[in-house]
Every structure is written in structure tokens, then in C-alpha cells.
Design a protein with these regions (language model features):
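Compositionally biased, intrinsically disordered low-complexity segments enriched in polar/Pro/Gly
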Residues: 1-131
Length: 131
């Protein structure tokens, strides 16, 4: 059953032969503010508008769960380095109003077999709203 997707790059799903999910997603929503400092008065704030939203998405990749960790990591790296713009959907609903770009990915290679096959890894991808 599909949980959601990050464009065609990753489909998050749970089935009898494959588990690919994220855990602990963090979404940050901020405003942009200027600070004016008049002499002899407290600083004045001025709202400039909304800032780009960001998401941090930790993902566990395991060959035991029907996922190819090395292939998935390579595809994520390509998306980062090529500036790929992607829709992000969870539960059939878009996350935010706009599409997203992956601004970075941090990988941990947990289990590498003696023949060099990566069988278990974690990756945290950093997304930023694309406007």
C-alpha cells in the first residue's frame, strides 16, 4: 500500500514484499522579519513575508525489506546534484502548496557485505519548497 511519494524518485509503501517508509519527518515553517533600531527606542519588527518551508526526512533502507539501498542512494544523489523539482505527497495530499527540491542528503552505510553490497543504510534528505 502506497503511503506517499517524492515525485517518481521514491514511492513510500508497505507491502508483503517491500517496506520503504520515513520516520520522524520534521517540517519547518517560518516568517521573514526585519528589525529596525530607532535611537532611544525598542527595536521595531517588520514582517517581510513567508520564508520557504523546509522538511527533514529520515529514511531507512534495507535489502531485507525489498529495497535496493545503493540504487536508492544513487538516485537521491542524482536528484540533489541535478536540482530536480519534485512533488511531495503523503496520504494522497500534497505536503505544502508548492513542489520541493532536495537541497542535501546525509547517508549512513550501516551494513556492507564482504562483496561490497550495501544491504542496510539510513539517509536523511533535506527538502526546500520550490517557488
Amino acid at each position: 500500500m502506497a503511503i506517499g511519494n517524492l515525485g517518481s524518485l521514491i514511492t513510500f509503501s508497505v507491502s508483503s514484499d517491500k517496506v520503504l517508509t520515513f520516520d520522524g519527518m520534521q517540517r519547518n515553517i517560518r516568517g521573514r522579519w526585519a528589525k529596525h533600531e530607532p535611537i532611544g527606542q525598542k527595536p521595531k519588527k517588520e514582517f517581510l513575508g513567508a520564508d520557504s518551508r523546509t522538511v527533514s526526512l529520515p529514511i531507512f533502507l534495507s535489502a531485507a525489506h525489498g529495497v535496493k539501498p545503493r540504487t536508492t542512494l544513487d538516485r537521491i544523489a542524482d536528484a540533489v546534484e541535478n536540482g530536480t523539482v519534485l512533488p511531495f505527497v503523503v496520504g494522497g495530499k500534497a505536503v505544502g502548496k508548492n513542489k520541493w527540491v532536495i537541497t542535501g542528503a546525509s547517508e549512513t552505510w550501516d551494513v556492507v557485505m564482504k562483496d561490497g553490497r550495501l544491504v542496510q543504510a539510513k539517509v536523511t534528505i533535506s527538502l526546500e519548497e520550490y517557488v
